[in-house]
Amino acid sequence: MEEKYSSQALAGGGVLGPVDVPSARLTRYIVLLCFAKFLKAVGLFESYDLLKAVHLVQFIFIVKLGSAFFMVLFQKPFSSGKVVTKHQWIKIFKHAVVGCIISLLWFFGLTLCGPLRTLLLFEHSDVVVLSLLSVLFTSSGGGPAKTRGAAFFIIAVICLLLFDNDDLMAKIAEHPEGHHDSALTHVLYTVIAFLGVADHKGGVLLLVLALCCKVGFHMASRKLSVDVGGAKRLQALSHLVSVLLLCPWVIVLSLTTESKVESWSSLIMPFITVIFFVVILDFYVESICSVKMESSKCARYGSFLIFISALLFGNFWTHPITDQLRAMNKPAHHESTEHVLSGGVVVSAVFFILSANILSSPSRKGQKGTLIGYSPEGTPLYNFMGDAIQQSSQSLPRFIKESLKQILEEYDSRQIFYFLCLNLAFTFVELFYGVWTNSLGLISDGFHMLFDCSALVMGLFAALMTRWKATRIFSYGYGRVEILSGFINGLFLMVIAFFVFMESVARLVDPPDIDTNMLTPVSVGGLIVNLVGICAFSHAHSHGASRGGCHSHEHSHSYHGHSHSHGHGHSHNDHGHSHGHSHVSSGGGMNTNMRGVFLHVLADTLGSVGVIVSTTFIQQFGWLIADPLCSLFIATLIFLSVIPLLKDACQVLLLRIPPEQEKDLHAALEKIQKIDGVISYRDPHFWCHSASVVAGTIHVQVVSDVMEQRIVQQVTAILKDAGVNNLTVQVEKEAYFQHMSGLSTGFQDVLAMTQHLESMKYYKDGTYIM
């Protein structure tokens, strides 16, 4: 939905915030924008191919010449509009000079980084960059959300600088020191070499600088575009002046340097493609969409599509499937390996997409309302319920600080956190030493430990979420997250055990050779770390093994805990509906989350023991079959140990009556049946919500002259003794069924109520109730 801000005042005197209006008419502009950005990505990849054969200045001159020709032809800047004054011509000249400099930086960065990285770094809208600079250099940067967006942007740039392997050796061989195509490229390469960074990293910094210059250039051009009669007229005149500025330089280059182009006629279509896709189409579509849509929407959709297109072409541009999109012919039997996709650039693209989405989002200063109609007086009525349930954003440092405080407050989460820190420390030591000694075994085991840390993180997050307060949407709170966490951890372990079992069976047939040089010290170190975890989480195993369901403990001493119950009811036509809640201090019980974490640690411990045993047999006796045999034994143990966890978690998720409380609940229902004034009960439902909450609902039929609150108190007390600490009791009388029969209920419902009514007129001993 498109958001528009209205200046009308509400009846109460408040100012109306953004109001949702239909956005179906914007679909065509969104599609047009996405199509233009897709073609711009094609044009920039084509530009990179052209720059391999054409000098940088010649390339910019031809692009400016073609753009000036089309824009002067379309806009007619000399025959339409007011006459441009001499002072304005001077400003247009300065505008053209700065535009040429930015183009030089842009396309030189393209030659250094390739089209994929150039699109990721340079194709950010002014809205995104201004929001980024506002967060970095002003005190009112837009709140925590904008701060996260700025952090994502910086992380994306760092990923390109540090974790992106961009074929540096090929680039060094391509332009050895002392040989460059022209004085301009020599100067730029000298500056990059002076900074002490590789060409690819220098290109990243150059494109970031060009991006900032582009945004400042656009901001400074706004007043000039108004003075000369619009942005389109300014662009036409500026491109024309740029051609005149670059013409002498191009002539000198043509006379002093040897051209790499074999046939200029073969480059006509590639240049037309670049001019139309990169300059003309993108400029006009941006102009139209910025008028029809909000700038934030334009930036968000445009950035997302061009980044996705960049990743797509970065992987398939040299593939035969893209030959139809390429205007410039690819040399036969040639597959380029420069500027290919890497893990760093993919991660960077993800962070760029996230940052563009966050930084381009408008700061909401009013409530978001939907027009639902008009009052009899003609005043517009708006619904603001959508924002009423939204939570306010919170700064990341404060969220981390409060989360850490909550983690350290409770025993379970504190144990997980301490063991996670120990596990991470061992993991990074293992990875560092593996990289230092070039040991593939240490590196692979380090990443295996890192995967185990992810299970600990999930368990820690689940332990933290269980203490979150209930909200309007999640009215029961987040206690069941620990059940889900344990269930997912159990599934992970079962999948791991299955694959280990299958691999072990395959290795039994053909045992491979094993390098045991580093296995023993690594396994001993892992065993020590995991034994610490076994000691830390053993209480979870003991609770889970002793009682498979969920339960709560009550203490009679006041200083151990507290227990209270309350009920409230109302009677309308002799029908009472009451809720009784008893809150009991939880002293233990099955914690599925902790059991899942414990089983993960146990599996790692068994793995370390198995590696030590198999390594000993291999080193002493040369029994290669010991490794798959130990793996088979360990996989079987893991599988069998996970089954009870999954069984208990499934029972909780399926709302089964807690097994250990079945007898108590059955006895409690018999006691309820014997309460004075109670005729019968129906629809008793009891289930385990979490490790410390057993919930239940029950309908109790009573005689007409009984006091509802007394029944509620007695039923609540009986079921609380049976372990139900979150109870809803509905009291029903004979007049209630008569009242419901008179309503517009279905025939089957009325028939069932009537039959139940007849059964209520007699006690079990046959006595008739008057």
Swiss-Prot record:
Gene3D superfamilies in the record: Cation efflux protein transmembrane domain (1.20.1510.10)
Catalytic activity entry: Zn(2+)(in) + 2 H(+)(out) = Zn(2+)(out) + 2 H(+)(in)
Membrane topology: Multi-pass membrane protein
Lumenal topology ranges: 51-53, 117, 171-190, 257-264, 322-339, 437-445, 502-517, 619-622
Binding site for Zn(2+): 448, 452, 600, 604
UniProt KW keywords: Antiport, Cytoplasmic vesicle, Golgi apparatus, Ion transport, Membrane, Metal-binding, Transmembrane, Transmembrane helix, Transport, Zinc, Zinc transport
Cell compartment(s), UniProt: Golgi apparatus, Golgi stack membrane; Cytoplasmic vesicle, COPII-coated vesicle membrane; Cytoplasmic vesicle, Secretory vesicle membrane; Golgi apparatus, trans-Golgi network membrane
GO molecular function: metal ion binding; zinc ion transmembrane transporter activity; zinc:proton antiporter activity
Cellular component GO terms, alphabetical: cytoplasmic vesicle; endoplasmic reticulum membrane; ER to Golgi transport vesicle membrane; Golgi apparatus; Golgi cis cisterna membrane; Golgi membrane; secretory granule membrane; trans-Golgi network membrane
Annotated family: Belongs to the cation diffusion facilitator (CDF) transporter (TC 2.A.4) family. SLC30A subfamily.
Subunit organization: Heterodimer with SLC30A6/ZNT6; form a functional zinc ion transmembrane transporter.
Entry protein name: Proton-coupled zinc antiporter SLC30A5
Native source organism of the sequence: Gallus gallus (Chicken)
